Protein backbone atom coordinates (compact mmCIF):
# COMPACT_ATOMS: atom_id res chain seq x y z
CA UNK A 1 0.00 0.00 0.00
CA UNK A 2 1.40 3.37 -1.01
CA UNK A 3 0.41 5.86 1.67
CA UNK A 4 0.98 8.72 -0.75
CA UNK A 5 -2.22 7.59 -2.51
CA UNK A 6 -4.34 7.71 0.65
CA UNK A 7 -7.41 9.92 0.25
CA UNK A 8 -8.88 9.62 3.74
CA UNK A 9 -8.18 8.67 7.35
CA UNK A 10 -10.58 6.82 9.64
CA UNK A 11 -9.62 7.50 13.26
CA UNK A 12 -10.57 5.50 16.32
CA UNK A 13 -11.10 7.78 19.34
CA UNK A 14 -10.67 6.06 22.73
CA UNK A 15 -6.98 5.42 23.41
CA UNK A 16 -6.06 6.91 20.03
CA UNK A 17 -7.11 10.56 20.29
CA UNK A 18 -8.16 10.73 23.95
CA UNK A 19 -6.62 9.20 27.08
CA UNK A 20 -9.60 7.15 28.22
CA UNK A 21 -8.74 3.45 28.22
CA UNK A 22 -7.93 3.15 31.93
CA UNK A 23 -11.10 5.05 32.75
CA UNK A 24 -13.06 2.48 30.75
CA UNK A 25 -11.35 -0.29 32.71
CA UNK A 26 -12.37 1.42 35.96
CA UNK A 27 -15.99 1.76 34.88
CA UNK A 28 -16.24 -1.86 33.72
CA UNK A 29 -14.64 -3.05 36.96
CA UNK A 30 -17.18 -1.15 39.06
CA UNK A 31 -20.10 -2.26 36.90
CA UNK A 32 -19.20 -5.93 37.11
CA UNK A 33 -18.72 -5.70 40.87
CA UNK A 34 -22.14 -4.09 41.28
CA UNK A 35 -23.63 -7.22 39.71
CA UNK A 36 -21.56 -9.58 41.84
CA UNK A 37 -18.78 -10.27 39.34
CA UNK A 38 -15.09 -9.49 39.66
CA UNK A 39 -12.24 -10.01 37.20
CA UNK A 40 -8.51 -9.15 37.15
CA UNK A 41 -7.85 -5.69 35.74
CA UNK A 42 -5.42 -7.05 33.17
CA UNK A 43 -8.22 -9.21 31.74
CA UNK A 44 -10.60 -6.25 31.65
CA UNK A 45 -7.92 -4.10 30.01
CA UNK A 46 -7.11 -6.73 27.38
CA UNK A 47 -10.63 -6.47 25.92
CA UNK A 48 -10.81 -2.65 25.83
CA UNK A 49 -11.48 -1.54 22.28
CA UNK A 50 -14.53 -3.73 21.85
CA UNK A 51 -18.07 -2.45 22.09
CA UNK A 52 -20.22 -3.83 24.90
CA UNK A 53 -21.88 -6.35 22.56
CA UNK A 54 -18.46 -7.95 22.06
CA UNK A 55 -17.05 -7.13 25.51
CA UNK A 56 -19.69 -8.72 27.77
CA UNK A 57 -19.48 -12.24 26.23
CA UNK A 58 -15.79 -12.34 27.22
CA UNK A 59 -16.81 -12.28 30.89
CA UNK A 60 -20.42 -13.39 31.24
CA UNK A 61 -22.19 -16.60 30.26
CA UNK A 62 -25.05 -16.42 27.75
CA UNK A 63 -27.45 -17.02 30.65
CA UNK A 64 -25.95 -14.14 32.65
CA UNK A 65 -26.12 -11.85 29.64
CA UNK A 66 -29.77 -12.75 29.22
CA UNK A 67 -30.53 -12.12 32.91
CA UNK A 68 -28.67 -8.87 33.55
CA UNK A 69 -26.42 -8.03 30.60
CA UNK A 70 -28.52 -5.13 29.34
CA UNK A 71 -28.93 -3.68 32.83
CA UNK A 72 -25.18 -3.96 33.49
CA UNK A 73 -24.34 -2.31 30.16
CA UNK A 74 -26.73 0.57 30.81
CA UNK A 75 -25.37 1.02 34.32
CA UNK A 76 -21.79 1.03 33.04
CA UNK A 77 -22.58 3.54 30.29
CA UNK A 78 -24.29 5.94 32.69
CA UNK A 79 -21.50 5.54 35.25
CA UNK A 80 -18.86 6.32 32.64
CA UNK A 81 -20.77 9.31 31.33
CA UNK A 82 -21.34 10.83 34.78
CA UNK A 83 -18.10 10.07 36.61
CA UNK A 84 -15.40 9.34 34.04
CA UNK A 85 -16.17 11.23 30.84
CA UNK A 86 -15.36 14.61 32.46
CA UNK A 87 -11.92 13.21 33.36
CA UNK A 88 -11.01 12.31 29.77
CA UNK A 89 -8.28 14.45 28.24
CA UNK A 90 -7.09 14.68 24.62
CA UNK A 91 -3.66 13.43 23.73
CA UNK A 92 -1.32 16.26 22.69
CA UNK A 93 -1.45 17.74 19.19
CA UNK A 94 -4.69 16.11 18.00
CA UNK A 95 -6.11 19.39 16.69
CA UNK A 96 -2.82 20.25 14.98
CA UNK A 97 -2.70 16.80 13.36
CA UNK A 98 -6.23 17.13 12.02
CA UNK A 99 -5.47 20.63 10.75
CA UNK A 100 -2.42 19.26 8.92
CA UNK A 101 -4.48 16.49 7.33
CA UNK A 102 -7.17 19.02 6.38
CA UNK A 103 -4.56 21.32 4.83
CA UNK A 104 -3.37 18.31 2.82
CA UNK A 105 -6.88 18.07 1.29
CA UNK A 106 -7.50 14.66 2.82
CA UNK A 107 -10.70 13.63 4.53
CA UNK A 108 -11.28 12.37 8.07
CA UNK A 109 -14.01 10.29 9.68
CA UNK A 110 -14.06 9.32 13.36
CA UNK A 111 -15.08 5.72 14.09
CA UNK A 112 -15.81 4.53 17.61
CA UNK A 113 -17.36 1.43 19.16
CA UNK A 114 -18.67 3.72 21.91
CA UNK A 115 -22.04 5.38 22.32
CA UNK A 116 -23.10 8.20 19.99
CA UNK A 117 -23.44 10.69 22.85
CA UNK A 118 -19.87 9.96 23.98
CA UNK A 119 -18.56 10.31 20.43
CA UNK A 120 -20.21 13.73 20.06
CA UNK A 121 -18.75 14.77 23.41
CA UNK A 122 -15.26 13.82 22.20
CA UNK A 123 -15.66 15.82 18.99
CA UNK A 124 -16.42 18.90 21.08
CA UNK A 125 -13.59 18.11 23.50
CA UNK A 126 -11.10 17.81 20.65
CA UNK A 127 -12.49 20.87 18.85
CA UNK A 128 -12.28 19.12 15.47
CA UNK A 129 -15.89 19.41 14.31
CA UNK A 130 -14.89 21.68 11.43
CA UNK A 131 -12.00 19.41 10.43
CA UNK A 132 -13.83 16.11 9.99
CA UNK A 133 -16.24 14.79 7.39
CA UNK A 134 -18.37 12.81 9.80
CA UNK A 135 -18.37 10.20 12.52
CA UNK A 136 -19.68 6.71 13.20
CA UNK A 137 -20.43 5.27 16.64
CA UNK A 138 -21.26 1.83 17.92
CA UNK A 139 -24.92 2.89 17.80
CA UNK A 140 -24.65 3.07 14.00
CA UNK A 141 -23.48 -0.53 13.58
CA UNK A 142 -25.10 -3.94 14.09
CA UNK A 143 -21.87 -5.25 15.61
CA UNK A 144 -18.97 -3.31 17.13
CA UNK A 145 -15.24 -3.91 16.69
CA UNK A 146 -13.64 -6.30 15.89
CA UNK A 147 -16.54 -6.76 13.45
CA UNK A 148 -16.02 -4.55 10.36
CA UNK A 149 -19.37 -2.72 10.63
CA UNK A 150 -18.08 0.53 12.12
CA UNK A 151 -15.32 0.91 9.53
CA UNK A 152 -17.64 -0.16 6.72
CA UNK A 153 -20.05 2.59 7.76
CA UNK A 154 -17.12 5.01 7.82
CA UNK A 155 -16.36 4.25 4.17
CA UNK A 156 -20.03 4.97 3.44
CA UNK A 157 -19.60 8.38 5.10
CA UNK A 158 -16.71 9.02 2.72
CA UNK A 159 -18.87 8.33 -0.32
CA UNK A 160 -18.28 4.60 -0.67
CA UNK A 161 -14.62 5.05 -1.53
CA UNK A 162 -12.40 2.04 -2.10
CA UNK A 163 -10.67 0.71 1.05
CA UNK A 164 -7.41 1.08 -0.90
CA UNK A 165 -7.88 4.86 -0.75
CA UNK A 166 -8.25 5.03 3.04
CA UNK A 167 -6.29 4.01 6.11
CA UNK A 168 -7.45 3.56 9.69
CA UNK A 169 -5.65 4.84 12.78
CA UNK A 170 -6.19 2.99 16.06
CA UNK A 171 -4.61 1.75 19.27
CA UNK A 172 -5.76 -1.85 19.79
CA UNK A 173 -5.57 -5.17 18.00
CA UNK A 174 -9.36 -4.98 17.68
CA UNK A 175 -9.04 -1.81 15.59
CA UNK A 176 -6.61 -3.61 13.31
CA UNK A 177 -8.78 -6.72 13.09
CA UNK A 178 -11.92 -4.70 12.32
CA UNK A 179 -10.03 -2.72 9.68
CA UNK A 180 -8.75 -5.92 8.06
CA UNK A 181 -12.28 -7.27 7.97
CA UNK A 182 -13.31 -4.09 6.11
CA UNK A 183 -10.36 -4.31 3.70
CA UNK A 184 -8.43 -1.46 5.36
CA UNK A 185 -4.85 -1.07 6.57
CA UNK A 186 -4.09 0.40 10.00
CA UNK A 187 -1.57 2.84 11.44
CA UNK A 188 -1.32 2.17 15.18
CA UNK A 189 -0.54 4.35 18.20
CA UNK A 190 1.06 3.15 21.43
CA UNK A 191 -0.66 5.71 23.66
CA UNK A 192 -3.62 3.41 24.34
CA UNK A 193 -1.38 0.98 26.18
CA UNK A 194 -1.20 -1.95 23.76
CA UNK A 195 2.37 -3.31 23.46
CA UNK A 196 4.12 -2.62 20.16
CA UNK A 197 4.69 -6.35 19.62
CA UNK A 198 0.94 -7.02 19.78
CA UNK A 199 0.17 -4.25 17.29
CA UNK A 200 2.83 -5.48 14.87
CA UNK A 201 1.65 -9.07 15.12
CA UNK A 202 -1.92 -7.91 14.48
CA UNK A 203 -0.75 -6.29 11.24
CA UNK A 204 -0.21 -2.56 11.81
CA UNK A 205 1.57 -1.07 8.80
CA UNK A 206 3.18 1.70 10.89
CA UNK A 207 3.38 2.44 14.60
CA UNK A 208 3.79 5.81 16.33
CA UNK A 209 3.88 6.84 19.96
CA UNK A 210 0.81 9.11 19.81
CA UNK A 211 -0.85 11.79 17.63
CA UNK A 212 2.03 14.20 18.27
CA UNK A 213 4.57 11.65 17.03
CA UNK A 214 2.46 10.94 13.95
CA UNK A 215 2.26 14.67 13.23
CA UNK A 216 6.06 14.95 13.36
CA UNK A 217 6.43 12.16 10.80
CA UNK A 218 3.30 12.87 8.75
CA UNK A 219 4.92 14.72 5.85
CA UNK A 220 7.78 12.25 5.59
CA UNK A 221 5.41 9.28 5.66
CA UNK A 222 3.00 10.64 3.09
CA UNK A 223 5.77 11.79 0.77
CA UNK A 224 7.64 8.51 0.82
CA UNK A 225 4.59 6.29 0.48
CA UNK A 226 6.47 3.69 2.48
CA UNK A 227 5.21 1.53 5.30
CA UNK A 228 7.10 1.73 8.59
Role assignments for model-derived ranges:
Residues 217-225:
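Short amphipathic alpha-helix with an adjacent loop that forms part of the alpha/beta core around
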Residues 17, 24, 118-119, 150, ...:
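Conserved short alpha-helix immediately C-terminal to the canonical SAM/SAH-binding motif I
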Residues 8, 145-176:
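Conserved Lys-Pro-Asp/Glu-containing loop-to-beta segment of HAD-superfamily phosphomonoesterases
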Residues 23, 47, 51, 89-93, ...:
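Short beta->alpha linker loops
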Residues 26-29, 33-35, 55-66, 87, ...:
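Substrate-recognition/cap helix-loop segment adjacent to the acidic, metal-dependent catalytic center
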Amino acid sequence: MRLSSVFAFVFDIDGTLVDSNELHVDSWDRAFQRFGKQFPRDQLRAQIGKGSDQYLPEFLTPEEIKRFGKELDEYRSELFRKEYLPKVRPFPKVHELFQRIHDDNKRVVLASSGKKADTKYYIDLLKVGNLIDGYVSGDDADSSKPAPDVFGASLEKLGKISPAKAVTVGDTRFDIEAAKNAGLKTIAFLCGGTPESVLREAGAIAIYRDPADFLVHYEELMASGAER
